[in-house]
């Protein structure tokens, strides 16, 4: 169990029994950003999109076993990793959950021999928070919509 500012939570590798709760959490997070909630195809098929390709997907669970955050990481053959779908339940942001998820994904990439991790930030107006979050964690802009970090 990890201690957030207001609650305890744990981070585990994805299990299919959490699929519906994960999807609901992501839709809520997108809605809170003012986006029309839609689900990305990879979230419907975590195993084939991440784990079967050598990557990994994690979820953060609260004390009631509800999904409150997620992140995925795919490993590329060129020594790079790509981070995907870092979301935290909108009313639980700024409690260290996103940072903990990011740290786990970076550790996974590093342990698997990757030297660089990259992130596509999405559109500037909708995903404005990510443009502050990643640089705070050592990521550098490589163009207007992408950041990367040497591991």
Give the role of each language-model region.
Residues 1-6:
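Short, Lys/Arg-enriched N-terminal segments with co-localized hydrophobic residues
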Residues 93, 118-130, 148-151:
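Conserved beta-strand-loop-alpha-helix junction that forms the acyl-donor binding cleft
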Residues 112, 136-137:
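Alpha-helix C-caps/helix-loop-beta hinges
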Residues 9, 13-84, 89, 102, ...:
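Acetyl-CoA-dependent GNAT
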Residues 102, 109-123:
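Conserved GNAT acetyl-CoA-binding A-motif
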Residues 88, 94-107, 132, 136:
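Conserved acetyl-CoA-binding loop-helix of GNAT-fold acetyltransferases
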Residues 84-85, 90, 107, 111-114, ...:
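A structural preference for long, well-packed, hydrophobic secondary-structure segments
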């Amino acid at each position: 169990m990890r201690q957030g500012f207001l609650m305890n939570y744990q981070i585990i590798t994805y299990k299919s029994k959490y699929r519906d709760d994960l999807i609901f959490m992501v839709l809520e997070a997108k809605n809170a950003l003012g986006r029309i909630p839609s689900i990305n195809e990879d979230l419907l098929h975590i195993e084939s999109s991440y784990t079967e390709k050598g990557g990994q997907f994690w979820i953060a669970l609260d004390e009631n076993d509800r999904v409150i955050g997620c992140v995925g990481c795919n490993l590329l053959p060129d020594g790079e990793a790509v981070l995907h779908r870092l979301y935290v339940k909108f009313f639980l942001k700024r409690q260290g959950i996103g940072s903990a998820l990011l740290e786990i994904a970076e550790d996974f990439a590093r342990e698997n021999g990757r030297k660089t991790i990259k992130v596509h930030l999405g559109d500037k107006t909708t995903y404005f928070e990510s443009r502050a979050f990643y640089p705070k964690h050592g990521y550098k802009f490589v163009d207007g919509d992408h950041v990367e970090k040497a591991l």
